[in-house]
């Protein structure tokens, strides 16, 4: 029996969840934020309802790792570093090199760093977190769990763009997708909820949060997904545009006198989506404004419309589905949003019970008794999937 810590390192954050394995019991979870700023909030939740908070000076991720582990000892959550027997790191981009979670070696770390051009906002930060933990826990097995790995099963007909083929061969220009760990987790849970083997099911999973993606899962394998070469593609998101005609991007660069493509990408990634349409990236705020504010209404209606288009396309690709699975922040907490989506899909046999739908963040079958396609609400747990992969990969070495 050991303890496995799942890590999600951002450019200025370090989020963690500590599990007792193989029981999969959550012992503690928390985050260090604003790393490198004057003061950094440190939050740790543990036990039934204990919550530790402080503000510290955290110069870098190495300091953040030391603070987290030292506080776990001070709070008597662990007695020593030796109790941690595995570390799992979320890594956004695995490219074509990584089709599964892997034990992190120096070569693997170099490859993760080299893949930064596929996820410039994420992979460098993920690599920094890996190095920091390697410094503090050098002899503990560390495993990289890639957001893209689940989508490695996509066929070429779905991952290739209609560009000169040598762009794919020379530059890796293809769809990779994202949120794979979340889609994989909720698919596994959906199978349990439906009481059927995952390998017999056709599912469409909707990860609806600040970043949103939709995946068609055919007998346990990712068949297609809405995000593309980067997590910018797909449906409308909090601050990301989703799908846009490339010619429009070139047109706007001329109109805005933008010569640096990174400047245009910043607009598409951080100033677009719900924020660009309605002035707020917060779906809860837009919901509050929906009945009185035409821009909030338009933004939400566009969000729903993009979702419905992808679900419709995936129903055609899959030739039907056993269930829609809704997850992530918006999906888990916004009952009105779930109802809107279901109402637009009644033609396909989707129907949810309004009474069952009045829940937030709990696992439940929301369907009416006569629905042809089940609608499942399943809170995601990417950290648990990471911890499971640490156990699996470390044991197989």
From Swiss-Prot:
Q: Which residues form the active site?
A: 147
Pathway membership? Metabolic intermediate biosynthesis; acetyl-CoA biosynthesis; acetyl-CoA from acetate: step 1/2
Report which reactions are catalysed by this protein.
acetate + ATP = acetyl phosphate + ADP
Which Pfam families does the record match to this protein? Acetate_kinase
Molecular function terms in GO for this entry? acetate kinase activity; ATP binding; magnesium ion binding
Q: How is the cofactor bound?
A: Mg(2+). Can also accept Mn(2+).
Q: What is its EC number?
A: 2.7.2.1
Q: Which SUPFAM superfamilies match?
A: Actin-like ATPase domain
Q: Which residues are recorded as binding ATP?
A: 15, 207-211
Q: Which InterPro entries match?
A: Ac/propionate_kinase, Aliphatic_acid_kin_short-chain, Aliphatic_acid_kinase_CS, ATPase_NBD
Which sites bind Mg(2+)? 8, 382
Which protein family is it in?
A: Belongs to the acetokinase family.
What binding partners and quaternary form does the record give?
Answer: Homodimer.
Protein name, please? Acetate kinase
């Amino acid at each position: 029996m050991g303890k496995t810590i799942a890590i999600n390192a951002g450019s200025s954050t370090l989020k963690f969840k500590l599990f007792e394995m193989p029981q999969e019991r959550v012992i503690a979870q928390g985050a260090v934020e604003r790393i490198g700023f004057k003061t950094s909030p440190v939050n740790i939740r543990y036990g039934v309802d204990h919550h530790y908070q402080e503000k510290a000076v955290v110069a870098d991720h190495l300091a953040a790792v030391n603070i987290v582990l030292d506080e776990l000892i001070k709070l008597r959550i662990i007695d020593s570093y030796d109790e941690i027997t595995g570390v799992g790191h979320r890594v956004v981009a695995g490219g074509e090199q990584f089709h599964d979670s892997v034990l992190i070696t120096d070569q693997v770390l170099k490859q993760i760093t080299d893949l930064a051009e596929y996820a410039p906002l994420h992979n460098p930060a993920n690599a920094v977190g890996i190095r920091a933990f390697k410094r503090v826990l050098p002899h503990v097995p560390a495993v990289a769990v890639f957001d893209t790995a689940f989508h490695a099963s996509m066929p070429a007909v779905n991952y290739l763009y209609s560009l000169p083929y040598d762009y794919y061969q020379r530059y890796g220009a293809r769809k990779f997708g994202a949120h794979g760990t979340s889609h994989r987790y909720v698919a596994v849970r959906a199978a349990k909820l439906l009481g059927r083997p995952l390998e017999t099911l056709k599912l469409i999973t909707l990860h609806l949060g600040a970043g949103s993606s939709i995946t068609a899962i055919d007998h346990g394998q990712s068949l297609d997904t809405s995000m593309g070469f980067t997590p910018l593609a797909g449906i409308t998101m909090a601050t990301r545009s989703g799908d846009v005609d490339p010619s429009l991007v070139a047109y706007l660069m001329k109109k805005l006198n933008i010569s640096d493509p990174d400047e245009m990408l910043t607009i598409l990634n951080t100033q677009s989506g719900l924020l660009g349409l309605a002035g707020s990236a917060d779906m809860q705020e837009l919901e509050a404004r929906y009945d009185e504010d035409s821009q909030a209404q338009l933004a939400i209606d566009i969000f729903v419309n993009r979702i419905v288009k992808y679900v419709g396309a995936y129903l055609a690709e899959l030739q039907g589905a056993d269930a829609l699975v809704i997850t992530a922040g918006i999906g888990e907490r916004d009952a009105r949003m779930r109802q809107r989506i279901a109402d637009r899909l009644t033609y396909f046999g989707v129907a949810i019970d309004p009474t069952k739908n009045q829940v937030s963040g709990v696992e439940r079958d929301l369907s009416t008794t006569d629905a042809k396609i089940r609608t499942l609400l399943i809170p995601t747990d990417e950290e648990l999937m990471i911890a499971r992969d640490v156990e699996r990969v470390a044991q197989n070495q």
